[in-house]
């Protein structure tokens, strides 16, 4: 899925984004500055990062970095955003960022503050011996590669046998393998 800019009369349409990725949400449209803020499945289909582009798609900029899931909330004048970040093994971290536009209209971000790091939850997970989840990729009989995750016990010993609980994918529109905390529900 990509972004398109259509005229109100429906007579013209221009593709704004291109590439081998999927846009998962339009976060905001800044009509004054002709920018679109959107979340994209990048750098892998399991991750979500915030990007901004101009209406012609020539200046796309990644505003959040790294693997994991960034859920964002922009302020009304598109100068700040809250980033609700987590990954498969990291509980939610909430940060506030300024959106900075220089004289050449290049866009970057500055971390303003960390609001919450879920420190108590991290301590409890360690105390309870919560195992680390890991991603895996499995080829199917048609040659497609399927994404999955595996949760091993905290004291996993590769020389021992363990019971396996296998959960299958529930169908279209229901992504079960996501790089966010809470995606592992076993």
Regions found by a protein language model. Give the residues of each.
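C-terminal substrate/ligand-recognition segments
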Residues: 1, 43, 140-144
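Structural motif
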Residues: 1-4, 45-51, 89-97
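Multi-bladed beta-propeller domains
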Residues: 6-30, 40-43, 53-70, 99-132
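Residue-level detector of Asp-centered blade-edge/turn motifs that repeat once per structural unit
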Residues: 30-33, 76-77
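Residue position within the beta-strands of beta-propeller blades
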Residues: 35-39, 81-84
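A broad, low-specificity signal marking well-ordered, structured residues that form hydrophobic/aromatic
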Residues: 36, 61, 136
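Serine-hydrolase catalytic core recognition
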Residues: 69-186
């Amino acid at each position: 899925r990509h972004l398109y800019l259509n005229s109100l009369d429906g007579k013209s349409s221009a593709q704004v984004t291109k590439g081998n990725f999927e846009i998962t949400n339009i976060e905001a449209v800044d009509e004054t500055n002709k920018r679109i803020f959107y979340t994209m499945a990048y750098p892998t289909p399991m991750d979500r990062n915030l990007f901004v582009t101009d209406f012609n798609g020539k200046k796309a900029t990644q505003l959040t970095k790294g693997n994991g899931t960034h859920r964002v909330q922009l302020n009304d004048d598109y100068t700040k955003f809250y980033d609700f970040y987590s990954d498969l093994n990291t509980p939610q971290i909430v940060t506030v960022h300024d959106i900075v536009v220089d004289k050449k209209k290049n866009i970057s971000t500055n971390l303003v503050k960390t609001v919450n790091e879920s420190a108590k939850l991290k301590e409890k997970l360690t105390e309870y011996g919560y195992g680390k989840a890991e991603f895996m990729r499995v080829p199917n009989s048609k040659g497609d590669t399927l994404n999955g995750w595996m949760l091993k016990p905290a004291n996993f010993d590769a020389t021992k046998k363990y019971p396996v609980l296998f959960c299958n994918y529930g169908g279209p529109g229901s992504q079960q393998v996501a790089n966010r905390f809470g995606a592992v529900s076993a």
